From Swiss-Prot:
Entry protein name: Large ribosomal subunit protein bL31B
GO cellular component, one term: ribonucleoprotein complex
Gene name for this UniProt entry: rpmE2
Record SUPFAM superfamilies: L28p-like
An annotated GO BP: translation
PROSITE patterns, alphabetized: RIBOSOMAL_L31
Lineage: Bacteria, Bacillati, Actinomycetota, Actinomycetes, Mycobacteriales
GO molecular function ontology, one term from the record: structural constituent of ribosome
A matching Pfam family: Ribosomal_L31
Transmembrane segments: none
Native species: Rhodococcus jostii (strain RHA1)
Length: 84
């Protein structure tokens, strides 16, 4: 491999924003926030909207994710379509 062309690959903690579940894995992503892991080390913390802990495909639960009233905004703008 060529030297100095690959991004820094390091341990990172990802946190699910809706469930609070955390995962320690390796990634090239960086963050200013940090988290203290159970091994006593501090790692960069990245908060994500959806993980396998909250995604309906993996949880088997169906739910509507309406962020900041986007559905209502769409319905106000274009109207609600009625089924025949």
């Amino acid at each position: 491999m060529k030297a100095n062309i690959h991004p820094d690959y390091h341990p990172v903690v990802f946190q699910d924003a809706s469930t609070g579940t955390t995962f320690l894995t390796r990634s090239t992503v960086t963050s200013d926030r940090t988290a203290l892991w159970s091994d006593g080390n501090t790692y960069p913390l990245v908060v994500v909207d959806v993980t396998s802990e909250s995604h309906p495909f993996w949880t088997g639960a169906q739910r509507v994710m309406d962020t900041a009233g986007r559905v209502e905004k769409f319905e106000r703008r274009y109207g609600v379509r009625k089924r025949p």
